[in-house]
Each structure stands twice: as C-alpha cells, then as structure tokens.
Curated annotation (Swiss-Prot):
GO CC term (a single one): chloroplast thylakoid membrane
Family: Belongs to the calycin superfamily. Lipocalin family.
Alphabetical list of Pfam families matching this protein: Lipocalin_2
GO terms, molecular function: nutrient reservoir activity; small molecule binding
Lipid metabolism as UniProt keyword: yes
Biased segments, Low complexity type: 1-18
Induction pattern: Accumulates in response to drought, high light, paraquat and abscisic acid (ABA) treatments (at protein level).
Cellular localisation: Plastid, Chloroplast thylakoid lumen
Name of the protein in its database record: Chloroplastic lipocalin
C-alpha cells in the first residue's frame, strides 16, 4: 500500500480453506515498528549535502478523471507534497533517507484491546480478510515487497520501484492498521517517495449501503479497504491479506480484479525459490505467475544507518500531506475551476518569491 502499497479483491476468491499455503523455510522475523517518512536521496556525497523531501510523482495526474484536473492542479501546488524541503546534513551518508522517528525502532509490544467495541472491531477485521483468523497485531511490523503485479490506478507511479517496503502498525484505539509505504525510484540511489494510509474494515450496517448484488449473493459481510485520509482525491482501495504466516511471508491483494497483488517477505532477499513458490501459490487464486514481477531489493542501507536516519527531524507533515503555512501578507483568492491559468499565475509568486 507507496505507493499504494502499499495495497484486494471485493469479491472473495476461491475459498482459502481449499488451499494450504506452502510452508515457509525462513524463520527470521522483523518487528520494526518504524514510521516511514519520505525523502529524496543524494546521488553523490557532497560537502554540505541536501535532503529534499517530496511526494511528487507518486501518482500520474493523467490517471485521474478529467473533471478533477483543474482542481487537482491547485491542490498539488498548494500541498506539502508539491514542495521540496531541504535540510542541511552533517552526516556522510550517500543515500540519506529520512524514514521516521528513532523512538519507534524496536519490537512491536502491542496488546489486544479489552473493551467490547474494540473487540468487535477486531473480530470484524479478522473476518474481513481471506487469511483465516487474521491477526492484525502479528501482521504488524516491517514487510519487504519481493514481487508484485500492479496494473491500473493502484499501481500508478510504482513501475520503476526498488526496495519497496511497508511498515504496518495496529492502532488499537481506531481498530485500524496504519500503513507507511515507500520505494526508491529508478535505481538503488534514486529518489524516495512515500505515503501513509489506513486499513479499516466495513461492518454489516455500512456494507449494505455500498455492496453490489454479486456481493450480496455471495454473502460477503465484511470488507477491508485502504484509505488515504489526508489525500481526498485518491479513492479507497480494497485491501485483503490472502494468506500469511506472520513470520516469513504475506500475500496481499489491492484491487477489485486481479490487477494488483504483492508478495511480502520479512527479509529483503529471501531467495528465488521463495519468490517462485508464492507466485505459483497465487495461481490458485486466479493470478498469472508470469505477470508477477520481482521487486529489486538492492538498496545498501544497514540497520544502523536506518536507525541513524530515523533520528533526524521528522517530516510528518510531508507524509500526511499537511498544508504548510505560506506566510502570506494578504489574502489570495483562488478559483481553479473557472480559470486554471489565473490560479497558476497567483501560485507561482508564492513559491518563487
């Protein structure tokens, strides 16, 4: 779910009880509960390097409907995602990427909620996933995308991704899973983009308002979706954990059809046999293994470097698309729906004054 990763089919696939997931061979597990942030890395070591944070190129504007183009142009230019925020760094990292807060590093020590409402929401999430008895607490932590199929809107902007990762954190108060995903574009030392989303499941009452006739016929009563609360023009996307053993692998669907699926591993390079095994397993759910492409995990960032980078000043505003204070001396009136050109003329001086 960056990238929409971070990132499931509205119609339930062939019952998962009919298939047994292949046994995983790896036992290593990472529970890093880091909060991913995004930045652009420097391609070479400079005396006074700059770290520029940006969410640009996350999504292709052409993928949005024409009726939103003019409004989207203003939103993009006004939002934090359209700005480059530079920070002077004294460290010598060649690929400095700000990924979160150092306080978030470590094991996930989460407990299940005890009140009745939270327990009800937990049960709804467990039943909303194809994976039997899905446990959002055990699912939390760091996952590496080692293979994926990404077509349509959900895959926009991820075609050249390296080192795609997702960090999942279970929010007990909201009974939701926070999803922080990012990837490095073009090459191991390319620029990084990231986005934060939230996975929530819809109960029976809300589902009746939106479910299709086919879904009613199949009696699918709970569904889970990935939303991006701070970016309103991105539609909610289905989210379904097809299968997982929590310690080694997870298979995640992110579209109503068979156009988006991810193979997750707890380790960045589990080996070709691991990847081939789970590609073939997805064939039982209607996916074509030949169309599922490997995701390069070739970024040379050690855990120590990652922890150091995470101790840098936070970029929460960028990740959550919060609007910056422009410091205007007087009010400016924008009307992007009637005059895009006039709006752009007013915006340019704000960013280049």
């Amino acid at each position: 779910m960056i990238l929409l990763s971070s990132s499931i089919s509205l119609s339930r696939p062939v019952s998962s009880q009919s298939f047994s997931p292949p046994a995983a061979t790896s036992t290593r597990r990472s529970h890093s509960s880091v909060t991913v942030k995004c930045c652009c890395s420097s391609r070479r070591l400079l005396k006074n390097p700059e770290l520029k944070c940006s969410l640009e190129n996350l999504f292709e504007i052409q993928a949005l409907r024409k009726c939103f183009v003019s409004g989207f142009a203003a939103i993009l230019l006004l939002s934090q995602a359209g700005q480059g925020i530079a920070l002077d760094l004294s460290s010598g990292y060649q690929n400095i990427c700000q990924l979160g807060s150092a306080a978030a590093v470590g094991e996930n020590k989460l407990t299940l909620p005890s009140d009745g409402d939270s327990e009800s929401m937990m049960m709804m999430m467990m039943r909303g996933m194809t994976a039997k008895n899905f446990d959002p607490v055990r699912y939390s932590g760091r996952w590496f995308e080692v293979a994926s199929l990404k077509r349509g809107f959900a895959g926009q902007g991820q075609e050249d991704c390296h080192c795609t990762q997702g960090v999942y954190t279970f929010d007990m108060k909201e009974s939701a899973i926070r999803v922080d995903t990012f990837c490095v574009h073009g090459s191991p030392d390319g620029y990084i983009t990231g986005i934060r989303g939230k996975v929530q499941c819809v109960g029976a009452e809300d589902l009746e308002k939106s479910e299709t006739d086919l879904e009613k016929q199949e009696m699918i009563k709970e569904k889970c979706f990935l939303r991006f609360p701070t970016i309103p023009f991105i539609p909610k996307l289905p989210y379904d954990v097809i299968a997982t053993d929590y310690d080694n692998y997870a298979l995640v669907s992110g579209a109503k059809d068979k156009g988006f699926v991810q193979v997750y591993s707890r380790t960045p390079n589990p080996g070709p046999e691991f990847i081939a095994k789970y590609k073939n397993y997805l064939a039982q759910f209607g996916y074509d293994p030949e169309k599922i492409k490997d995701t390069p995990q070739d970024c040379e960032v050690t855990d120590a470097e990652l922890a150091a980078m995470m101790s840098m000043p936070g970029m929460e505003q960028t990740l959550t698309n919060q609007f910056p204070d422009l410091g205007l001396r007087k009010s400016v009136q924008f009307d992007p729906f009637t005059s895009v050109f006039e709006t752009l003329k007013k915006l340019v001086p704000l960013y280049f004054k």
